Amino acid sequence: MHLAYLDESTKPGPIAIFGAVVVPPGNWGWMERLHGIAIEQLFKIDEIAEKFQEFHAFELFKGEGAFKGIDEDKRYTAIEVLLSAMQGYDFPFIYGAVDEEKLTNSSLAKGLFGMARPLTAAFRLCVLGIEDWARKQHPQRDEAVTVDYKDNYLLIVDDTTDIELKRRLQFTYKVLRAKHPYSNPKPDNNRLWHSHDQMYFGDSVSCLGIQLVDLCTYFMQRHLLKRDKSHRDKADEFFDIFAPNVICAKPEPEWSEYREFIVSHDDNAQARVPQSTHDAKSKGQTA
């Protein structure tokens, strides 16, 4: 089973984004090993238990919090080591992003994606993007969704103290992932055929995958917010490490119906795209 780690970016800005790193079976151990190597770039082994708890993207990049006073070269090397997991083991990074201002000011806000909160809309896009990715790992047929159990995935979301946000995320998941899908009289209600029957929340302190997706989501949002693409900085170099693995979630019908609110890194993102038969839309299913 694939492990899909999800996190939102808390960086202030006009874009609400939820990102996911998918770790295929057999690769988690390599991610943990690289995580350990990254820690060793910053602290002596006998200091780790006392000085290190977790990697926070903003703090690590800016030299704040637990990383205050640590040499920039060491911090940047740690980031490169962490992101090398994306490059070396070909982990996909899937994200959903929406324009907060456009969505908030729109008269369609309440009906859009079935919710009004931009971050919840970004989560919906991201989760559907993971489903689209899972379906594309094996052949599909036009008449129905073909499910391959080797491409099942488990969603592990960074836990939050925002009770209302957590409630909305749980509700969104239950709307997308129908209960008892194989015995449901309306199979079209299920849009997450490859998802585990439950979504879990993890503590980032003890969850390495959440720390990795936090890093990717942070640099993804910086990339989306950047206006002058001709001016490059260190953040661009870090983004380039996992850029080949980046997938903008474009589920249908959301992508076509609400394209003006969705933010994408694709060069031709302004163009409306035709509906794919492999997308995580309402459709029948075959195993």
Task: Go through the PLM ranges and name each one.
Residues 1-287:
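Phosphate-ester processing/binding pockets and catalytic centers
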